[in-house]
């Protein structure tokens, strides 16, 4: 009979002929209510405890969950190993204790572990080199569990989806075991086919939140070395994007993402992916507020009972402006003990309250994640500093400042295979840093496609992004008449605020030979604009990282950006006099954020394009040879992984 064994100490035996969900009663010492956990794995499983003495096996028929007796030498729960039918050989799946070589530990200890988020500090990037981490494989491998509301190509609305679709693959390539957990969105469109290869694992988990028992199931696809796990529930099956539709944000988003977080905490314990679970010694990487309940649950509902005591959590902040704030009365919906309200409790300032009797009390999930996570990563070094300021902290600056010693900034990477001008299937001509002669043909093809006069000598400026206040679209609107006086062409691609969409259409009607606006988003045209334009404009008010400037530099298109967040970190301001007149830099960084400073930077860039071709080619090649691959970012993440296990986990 096929059996499920755990390192010789615990054995699962299937009941022959049964195919129903079986309820397991957790052991009393864990303190969980009886209805807390329920799952099925195809046939029902009977858990028998067995121990070996002098070759004899003794079994107890008591049905139970794993106790301390079934842990390895470090105290971690052993993973589940599926034994092939007819083969009763025991296979050990102990995770083992993560250790560090003494010489590496000494090197790590020499790193100054403070103020990593301050702009200009390269501790994270240099740390990997200091301890001699190999470029191909990680020195210490981990069980990594990404929890996210979106992951490309399955679901994507912005940079978050790009990060969670690419970084896990890079880390898996370096030897880590990686799981990505996100909802299984079905909205009745062609995008549903993205989940076609994901198979139902036949496992059901029941969790307690929102005043009752909620059952979810799991789908799984193994791709590019990563376990892609999708939490399935009817609340994820509706038209629109992951967060809302044309009418606005979904009213039950708190429920939908609370469900995701509870399921994510259970997944490493119950999903036998590849034959065995990830187990308790997992490192959770939770992304933005949607996954922010995970570190709170680990601290409030698991560690007090000895579960996940060896796990750690890292909060990755992609955009601090979104915090998951809901009325205080919704706290009981989160499935947390009553005494943990202080972790997520939040009070709005007086000026933000709606009426005189409004106390301002609310629940802030991201605040709770900041309090309980073991370490915090932002998507650029500049943003790590900005979130501790009044201007960039969105009310959380004091809390973040108090945790400054555990905040690290790591710049996002890009998919260098998808964004490669020498092989890009979306552009008509290919080129590289060694030979950029075909780029001008991409420009002429774009002018023809958009119906603009074909003028290869005319500087062409592009903008790709959301049409909203954060992206500085109002600044472009104000500067439009001034820019149209110059001998330039301007192309914009994006959607968002209807008033800016209307403005784009009116600009195109007024300046038929100079301006084109494409309302919406189209992947092929975004590639062609990136390749065909000479300059890419990004006047964002704040930009945690930004990806378009990285794509632009990869394609030899010069970025002109506002000096904020990741834009300031990744674009080096052009200096034509450095290096004996050879010049340094990859673009123009303007500040302050004003129409005059932006127009001035654009005019400097256009003049350089027209009059100083050698300097322009230097700008192009320096940008094209920069390394912004995910493999480079993965090495920096590994340094933080080592640091997070040096300290005990958050408990209370």
UniProtKB/Swiss-Prot annotation:
It comes from the Eukaryota. One of its GO terms (cellular component) is amyloplast. It catalyses: [(1->4)-alpha-D-glucosyl](n) + ADP-alpha-D-glucose = [(1->4)-alpha-D-glucosyl](n+1) + ADP + H(+). ADP-alpha-D-glucose binds at residue 156. Residues 1-49 form a transit peptide. Induction: Circadian-regulation with the lowest levels at the end of the dark period. Coiled coil: none annotated. Pathway: Glycan biosynthesis; starch biosynthesis. GO terms for biological process: amylopectin biosynthetic process; endosperm development; starch biosynthetic process. Its main location: plastid. InterPro entries: Glyco_trans_1, GS/SS, Starch_synth_cat_dom. Its EC number is 2.4.1.21. It is found in: Plastid, Chloroplast; Plastid, Amyloplast. Keywords: Amyloplast, Chloroplast, Glycosyltransferase, Plastid, Starch biosynthesis, Transferase, Transit peptide. Disruption phenotype: No visible phenotype under normal growth conditions, but mutant plants have reduced starch content in leaves. One of its GO terms (molecular function) is alpha-1,4-glucan glucosyltransferase (ADP-glucose donor) activity. Expressed in roots, leaves, stems, buds and flowers. Involved in the synthesis of short glycan chains within amylopectin in leaves. Is required to generate chains up to about a degree of polymerization of 10 (DP10). Belongs to the glycosyltransferase 1 family. Bacterial/plant glycogen synthase subfamily. This is Starch synthase 1, chloroplastic/amyloplastic.
